Amino acid sequence: MTGPLLPHVPHDMATFGWPSSNPLRLAASNLAFPRSRISSRSKTATESPDWQGASGCLTLYYGHTDAEDMMLTRRQALVRSAAGAMMGGRASFARASQPATPVDFEIPANACDCHTHIFGEPDKFPFWPGRSYTPESALPEEMSALHRALHMARVVIVTPSVYGTDNLATLYGIEARGANARGIAVIDETTPERNLDAMAMAGVRGIRLNLATAGQTDPAVGRQRFRAMADRVKRRGWHIQMYTSLAVVSGIKDLVRDSPVPVVFDHFGGAQAALGLEQPGFADLLELVRSGRTYVKISGAYRSSSRAPDYADAAPLARALIAANADRIVWGTDWPHPNSNTPAGRAPTEVTPLLQIDDGRLLNQLAVWAHDPAIRKKILVDNPAQLYGF
């Protein structure tokens, strides 16, 4: 049922336990600085207790100038300032939703929510000026509370469109969750290789092409961007995650079949529940899933269906995808449920409230879509472990 895929990058869990030999720390002396400066910095880089995790690789990610050699960059200072605010036990939270309905089936150990976002406090994690909407904040401790309620041990954090190619909020979310987190970044043709190196060490395992939020449905654009990104990530064993329409899926089907990297389609591959199983492009998506070349996230059901709270019309789509190849399906909440459609009369720079979605009830639909616990274990545990290298 499964086609050949590039092997995932193996991960030594000690990497995330912060021993003195942590590759993130070693990267500071090996890659981030010219050799003429290693002697003045390598001891600090390898011994400082805050040189670890995603924050520990930021020197590699952003680099230094000679003038900044013996001081924190502004970016690092912001991150370390954010550490106190975001990991110091804040008493007040933002308005991100929490589950109202208890989970009504047994969640297997090491289950993974494969689609989430972090929206940091704007003064510490500024938004991209070209964004199409502005969300409320949604912080790592809120996400942790969500996952305790859902019995999710692992998480994948995806850089949302509002940050452009700035992946700092995602890296910080990974840092907050440690060994149980992976990330999906957004890059472009100008992103330096050293940034990709740093993000790989921090736990990033793929890059996202988001065509849907910008309303881009031209398959020609999808083909061009897909080719460019596949060339960037193929040597790393990463994958390409796409948020797009079924029209684009059909338009790039041949590229996906021949792709040197795995491909993941977000949110039911762009299928719309109201249009049913015969909608244009859905057969192409099923074909790619059967081939083993493509994963699909049965995530954010409310983006495919308007029939809240159970999204009953999404069930045939989910069941068809699972039946096509259960080894290529993963699940996600899409927490904190940003409303990417700015209301009429509101500027994209004005804050649009997060959607209030009951993720407990949403997760309970997985047992409706997949009755067999063994299939649910594949979707929640085994497939994410393979795809993201847990």
Would you name each region that the model predicts?
Residues 2-9, 15, 36, 40-42, ...:
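Short, intrinsically disordered low-complexity segments enriched in Ser/Thr with adjacent Pro
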Residues 9, 31, 49-72:
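N-terminal secretory signal peptides
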Residues 16, 56-58, 91-112, 116-119:
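C-terminal segment of N-terminal export signals and the immediately downstream linker at the start
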Residues 69-84:
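N-terminal secretory signal peptides and thylakoid transit peptides that target proteins
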Residues 94-102, 278-390:
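H/E-rich (His + Asp/Glu) clusters that bind or coordinate divalent metals
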Residues 112-116, 155-157, 183-185, 207-209, ...:
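Hydrophobic faces of well-ordered beta-strands that scaffold small-molecule active sites
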Residues 129-177:
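Alpha-helical scaffold segments that flank or form the walls of functional sites
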Residues 162-247, 254-257, 290, 295-309, ...:
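Active-site gating/metal-coordination segments in enzymes
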